[in-house]
């Protein structure tokens, strides 16, 4: 097995891919292998299940990346430093995900807490545990991996719960354009996911749709 983590990217329209590639080239060590998959699977989950299976044949660990993110000069170094710390402290480690400016909950830098210090919230200096992360740019080990469900919205919730692992938000940051895969029609995204959730995860369905 190759000891270094691989970067795994799935893309549909590839509108932002050139910028991601440029930032990877500029800020990620040259020995890190990157896998790009275009037009695989009908959903986000199906695409990344396919991509992870291929990458895990040669790597014990991968970093899942959306195609519409941009690395900073410190993203890779900080993310892997936090992974190393957590490996020592957490036996059942799941995802370790970068923060961004377009993410849910505490993973979004706008949700920071504490005083502002050089335009960053104090909380951005800390690793934070959370039950669900969005793998916009997220490290995961093959031993923790379980497949995504065949849906777009709420696939993160399902996968993170099915892993039965502890997930963390890193101090690392990536810029995220957002809504390039599923689009901006929230009502449609909700409606597309509802039948699968109702049939397979009724408790989660009740949380988001208010009925079983």
Predicted regions and their residues:
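Active-site nucleotide-sugar/metal-binding loop of Leloir-type enzymes
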Residues: 49-61
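A recurrent flexible, glycine/aromatic-enriched loop bordering the glycosyltransferase active site
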Residues: 119-140
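Short, acidic, metal-binding catalytic loop of nucleotide-sugar glycosyltransferases
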Residues: 2, 19-34
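C-terminal catalytic/acceptor-binding lobe
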Residues: 150-212
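Conserved donor-nucleotide/metal-binding helix-loop-beta segment in metal-dependent transferases, i.e.
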Residues: 76-95
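A short, glycine-/small-residue-rich helix N-cap motif at loop->alpha-helix starts
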Residues: 39-47, 52, 152-154
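Short beta-strand-to-loop acidic/aromatic patch adjacent to the donor-nucleotide binding site
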Residues: 59-70
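Short beta-strand-to-loop element that shapes/binds the nucleotide-sugar donor at the catalytic cleft/hinge
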Residues: 94-111
């Amino acid at each position: 097995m190759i000891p270094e983590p691989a970067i795994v990217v799935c893309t549909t329209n590839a509108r932002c891919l050139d910028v991601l590639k440029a930032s990877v080239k500029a800020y990620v060590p040259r020995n890190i292998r990157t896998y790009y998959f275009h037009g695989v699977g009908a959903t986000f989950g199906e695409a990344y299940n396919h991509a992870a299976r291929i990458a895990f044949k040669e790597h014990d660990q991968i970093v899942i990346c959306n195609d519409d993110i941009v690395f900073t000069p410190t993203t890779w170094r900080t993310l892997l430093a936090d992974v190393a710390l957590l490996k020592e402290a957490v036996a059942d480690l799941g995802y370790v995900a970068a923060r961004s400016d377009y993410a849910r909950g505490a993973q979004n830098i706008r949700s920071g807490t504490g005083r502002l210090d050089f335009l960053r919230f104090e909380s951005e200096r800390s690793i934070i545990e959370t039950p669900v992360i969005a793998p916009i740019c997220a490290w995961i080990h093959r031993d923790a991996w379980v497949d995504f469900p065949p849906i777009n919205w709420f696939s993160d919730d399902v996968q993170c719960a099915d892993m039965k692992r502890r997930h963390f938000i890193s101090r690392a940051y990536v810029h995220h354009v957002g809504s390039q895969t599923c689009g901006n029609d929230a009502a449609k995204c909700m409606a597309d996911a509802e039948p699968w959730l109702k049939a397979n995860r009724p408790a989660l369905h009740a949380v988001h749709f208010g009925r079983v």
